[in-house]
Curated annotation (Swiss-Prot):
SUPFAM superfamilies (alphabetical): S13-like H2TH domain
Taxonomic source organism: Bacillus cereus (strain ATCC 14579 / DSM 31 / CCUG 7414 / JCM 2152 / NBRC 15305 / NCIMB 9373 / NCTC 2599 / NRRL B-3711)
Physiological role: Located at the top of the head of the 30S subunit, it contacts several helices of the 16S rRNA. In the 70S ribosome it contacts the 23S rRNA (bridge B1a) and protein L5 of the 50S subunit (bridge B1b), connecting the 2 subunits; these bridges are implicated in subunit movement. Contacts the tRNAs in the A and P-sites.
Residues forming coiled coils: none
Protein name from the UniProt record: Small ribosomal subunit protein uS13
GN (gene name): rpsM
Length: 121
């Protein structure tokens, strides 16, 4: 397995797919990286030379990926919470942030149901 940005990428897959194993690189970014490096998307990782891997690494070093990107996202969320914005409050309460309905659904964000016991009459 080749290591790129601290991630072992699979050898048997096409390069364009393997690059998506790095956090922060999707299909579009992977295609742009390969175009800039002058490498075919159809090439398998096992067929890449060290020179080609080096070119890919150099391009990825200029992009914010993995730990740096995760840190930036968490700092952005923390900033929203500290300034007391609506989005920050939604993050703090563990509710959907982008205006989705939360009366009936939103179970992914809210977690499992917490049932409330009935009052005796």
């Amino acid at each position: 397995m080749a290591r790129i940005a601290g991630v072992d990428i699979p050898r048997d897959k096409r390069v364009v797919i393997s690059l998506t194993y790095v956090f922060g690189i999707g299909r579009t970014t992977a295609e742009k990286i390969l175009a800039e490096a002058g490498i075919s998307e159809e090439t398998r990782v096992r067929d890449l030379t060290e020179d080609e891997l080096g070119r890919i690494r150099d391009i990825i070093d200029r992009i914010k990926v993995e730990g740096d990107l995760r840190r930036e996202v968490s700092l952005n969320i923390k900033r929203l919470m500290e300034i007391g914005s609506y989005r920050g409050l939604r993050h703090r309460r563990g509710l959907p942030v982008r205006g989705q309905n939360s009366k009936n659904n939103a179970r992914t964000r809210k977690g499992p149901r917490r049932t409330v016991a009935n009052k005796k009459k």
